[in-house]
Curated annotation (Swiss-Prot):
Compartment(s): Cytoplasm
Region (Domain II): 65-137
Record's protein name: Holliday junction branch migration complex subunit RuvA
Keyword NAD: no
Free-text note on domains in this protein's UniProt record: Has three domains with a flexible linker between the domains II and III and assumes an 'L' shape. Domain III is highly mobile and contacts RuvB.
Keywords, sorted A to Z: Cytoplasm, DNA damage, DNA recombination, DNA repair, DNA-binding
Gene that encodes it: ruvA
InterPro entries recorded: DNA_helicase_Holl-junc_RuvA_I, Hlx-hairpin-Hlx_DNA-bd_motif, NA-bd_OB-fold, RuvA, RuvA_2-like, RuvA_C, RuvA_C_sf
Similarity annotation: Belongs to the RuvA family.
Biological processes, Gene Ontology terms: DNA recombination; DNA repair
Length: 190
């Protein structure tokens, strides 16, 4: 498998770029976010890649960061999401925005992406729940240590992540874990 390519950028024709590596020109499909981040032609570039081998073609997909590639790999595992749709998702939002949409179960943000309807967005949210995190580089709800303990306690008590995060926002700074849990439960009871 080809995991990374470093070479000279010879052409940018959205959504494809061509990278010359020792006389071999690789055709690589990239999301628009990666395309816009690339330097002008003639510059040296490094792309993290994902190779798809089909009966009729070998397709190479490129990404500016390893976290984009990891998100792409998770997206194509969702039933009904192919490589083209996964590229469209990553063209329409950053990995952090995608992780946040999944965490907060915001199907409306996903339906703004061309090719993603309501049912596909809901399936994507269901199948990707909990799969994009710090290892992907997305921290959509980074919280201090004491607040993460409070969040974990609320989740263990059966509250949804969305409800728990909303309750955390009502807590004053510097609150201890036990007092924080108590106040968060009061906020959730309202």
């Amino acid at each position: 498998m080809i995991g990374r390519i470093t070479g000279t950028l010879i052409e940018k024709t959205p959504p494809v770029v061509y990278v010359d590596v020792n006389g071999i020109g690789y055709e690589i499909d990239v999301p628009m976010s990666t395309l816009y981040a690339l330097p002008d032609t003639g510059a040296r570039v490094t792309l993290f890649t994902h190779l798809v081998v089909r009966e009729d073609a070998h397709l190479l997909y490129g990404f500016g960061t390893a976290s984009e590639r990891a998100a792409f790999r998770e997206l194509v595992k969702v039933s009904g999401i192919g490589a083209r749709t996964a590229l469209a998702v990553l063209s329409g939002m950053s990995v952090a925005e995608l992780a946040q949409a999944i965490t907060l179960q915001e199907s409306g943000r996903l339906t703004r992406v061309p090719g993603i309807g309501k049912k596909t967005a809901e399936r994507l949210l269901l199948e990707m729940r909990g799969k994009l995190g710090a290892d992907i580089g997305a921290t959509p709800h980074a919280v201090p240590d004491s607040q993460s303990d409070i969040l974990n306690a609320l989740l263990a008590l059966g509250y949804s992540e969305k409800e728990s995060l909303a309750a955390l926002k009502t807590l004053p700074e510097g609150l201890g874990v036990s007092d924080g849990i108590r106040q968060a439960l009061k906020a959730l009871a309202r």
